[in-house]
A protein has these predicted regions:
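Short S/T/G/P-rich N-terminal loop/turn motif that feeds into the first structured element of a domain
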Residues: 1-123, 130-145, 151-178
Length: 178
């Protein structure tokens, strides 16, 4: 599965460009004014590319939380590795799968987490939750985890940007697979 992320006029979010309808869509409010962000999930890279989006992401991991199936109200969008270093992207994905995911999986209120990676090694993590406080608990939990013995702290430089925003609408596929 693949994804596109683009800025949108939230009043006109029904318009989709590309080859057919996306498998799923999440529309997020802007953190700093009018407008918003639309995340579309596509069955393949070709469908995603036909949207004309600046960047196409591959969905590399999906975590269904304890609140899976409930309507998400808040999203945390974490942008990692803006310089496109493949080693940093690999390290971030490894940390996510082997350290962070096990630590946060049991947190109440987490609906779903999507990990996206572009061909130029940018990583975006979209966490969907039923409340703002859930994202705060996730952050506290992540910061309390110790690095694994095989993690290199030099490659884990943190997020480039973190946006905590309201979810305006979310239509997630029932069986997202990476």
């Amino acid at each position: 599965m693949h994804a596109t992320i683009r800025a949108v006029d939230v009043a006109a979010t029904a318009a989709t460009t590309g080859d057919g309808d996306p498998l799923g869509t999440v529309v997020l409010a802007s953190s700093d004014g009018p407008g918003g962000t639309r995340l579309d999930l596509w069955p393949d890279a070709a469908s995603a590319a036909r949207t004309g989006a600046d960047r196409v992401y591959r969905v590399t991991d999906v975590m269904h939380g304890l609140a899976a199936g409930r309507r998400p109200l808040f999203a945390q969008v974490t942008w990692i590795n803006g310089d496109g270093d493949p080693a940093r992207a690999d390290a971030a994905e490894y940390a996510g799968r082997h350290r962070i995911r096990p630590a946060v999986h049991g947190i109440e209120g987490v609906v779903e987490v999507l990990v996206l990676r572009s061909d130029d090694h940018r990583v975006v993590v979209v966490g969907l939750a039923t409340g703002r406080e859930t994202h705060q608990e996730v952050q506290r939990t992540i910061m309390a985890t110790a690095l694994l013995p095989d993690e290199d702290p030099a490659l884990l430089t943190g997020a480039d940007r973190i946006d905590l925003v309201r979810v305006l609408s979310a239509e997630l596929p029932t069986a997202v697979r990476s």
